[in-house]
Regions:
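Metallo-beta-lactamase
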Residues: 10
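Nucleotide-activated chemistry modules centered on ATP-dependent adenylation/adenylyltransferase
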Residues: 1-5, 13-291
C-alpha cells in the first residue's frame, strides 16, 4: 500500500489507541508486529480487528541466550530500543517515512534511585531515549526516516480512558507481559498474578462497568488478598515501583480515587483509599497533555 506510515501494534491498549487515533484523523498506516520465536494469535486477532494492512517481522533468538547456566549475567534487555532499530530498517526497506510508536509520558519516570542515579526500567521508552535515537538515526543512518511516539503527551491513565471507548477490543487485547515470554502462557490473555495485571485493572476500573472489567480479568482483583502487595507497590506505599511497564504512583492514586464509590467494598479500597491523599485538581492534571 502506498502510504508513508508504519505503526507498531503489540496487542496492548496503548498501540490500539494509537491506531484508532490515526484512523480518526484519516491517516492511512500499515501495522507492524515483531513476533519472537512463536506465533502470537493475540496480536494477529488485534491486527485483524484494526482492519489495517500489516507486516510481520519474525525474530528468532539463539538458544544460548536463554541458557541460565552459561556463566554470564542475564540483565535487562532494552527491547523497545531493539524494536526502534527494527522500525528504521522496515522504513528503509519499504520506503516509508514515519514509524509510529505508543510510548507514553509515564515512561519518563524511574523506579528507584541508586548511587545518585535514577534507574528507569522503561528508559528505552522514554522521551530522553527518543531524542537521542532520533539524532543518531538522522546523523548516522538516514535523515529520511522519523520514528516517534504519538502518545508521548499522555499519562497512562489518559490512554486507558481513550482505550475504553473502543469496546470491540475488550475481548482480544492484553498488556500482560507474560504473554510475550518465549515460554509464556497460551491459554489466557491475563495471568492474573503480575504487577502489570494489577496496574491495568486499576487504570481501566474508572472507565468500564464492573462486569466488563471482571470479564477481561476473570475476577475482581480489588477483592483478591494476593494482590494487596502488588497494589501497595503500584500506589507507592511499598519499597519501589515494580520493574514492569507501570505508570507513576500519582496516576495510580488518581485511578483509585476515581473508583472510591464503585469499588468501595473491595479489599484494596479499604486498605489504601484513606492513605492516598489526593485532590480533584491533582486528578484532573493527569488527563491533560504534557509537554
Amino acid at each position: 500500500k502506498n502510504n508513508k506510515f508504519f505503526v507498531a501494534v503489540s496487542g496492548g491498549k496503548d498501540s490500539i489507541v494509537t491506531v484508532e487515533l490515526l484512523k480518526e484523523q484519516g491517516i492511512d498506516a500499515t501495522a507492524v508486529f515483531t513476533e519472537t520465536q512463536k506465533k502470537s494469535t493475540l496480536v494477529d486477532k488485534v491486527i485483524e480487528t484494526t482492519d489495517l494492512d500489516s507486516l510481520k517481522i519474525k525474530r528468532y533468538l539463539d538458544r544460548k541466550v536463554l541458557d541460565k547456566n552459561a556463566g554470564y549475567f542475564q540483565g535487562h534487555i532494552p527491547i523497545s530500543a531493539i524494536y526502534a532499530f527494527l522500525a528504521i530498517l522496515c522504513c528503509v526497506l519499504y520506503k516509508k517515512t514515519y514509524f509510529i510508536m505508543s510510548n507514553e509520558h509515564s515512561s519518563n519516570f524511574g523506579n528507584i534511585k541508586y548511587k545518585g542515579q535514577v534507574i528507569n526500567h522503561q528508559w528505552s521508552k522514554s522521551f530522553e531515549f527518543e531524542q537521542i535515537f532520533q539524532n543518531y538515526v538522522k546523523n548516522f543512518i538516514t535523515p529520511d526516516v522519523y520514528c516517534f511516539s504519538l502518545l508521548r503527551p499522555f499519562y497512562e491513565i489518559r490512554i486507558a480512558e481513550l482505550f475504553c471507548k473502543y469496546k470491540k477490543y475488550l475481548s482480544y487485547f492484553s498488556s500482560c507481559n507474560r504473554n510475550f515470554k518465549i515460554d509464556g502462557q497460551q491459554d489466557k490473555l491475563w495471568c492474573g498474578e503480575c504487577p502489570k495485571c494489577a496496574f491495568v485493572f486499576l487504570l481501566l476500573s474508572p472507565f468500564l462497568e464492573k462486569d466488563e472489567l471482571i470479564n477481561i480479568f476473570g475476577k475482581n482483583l480489588f477483592e483478591d488478598k494476593n494482590f494487596l502487595p502488588l497494589f501497595k507497590d503500584i500506589l507507592g506505599f511499598g519499597k519501589l515501583k515494580p520493574f514492569d511497564c507501570v505508570g507513576t504512583f500519582e496516576e495510580s492514586k488518581a485511578a483509585l480515587y476515581l473508583v472510591r464509590d464503585k469499588f468501595r467494598a473491595g479489599l484494596v479500597l479499604r486498605d489504601f483509599y484513606l492513605k492516598i491523599k489526593i485532590t480533584e485538581m491533582l486528578v484532573e492534571r493527569f488527563f491533560k497533555p504534557r509537554n
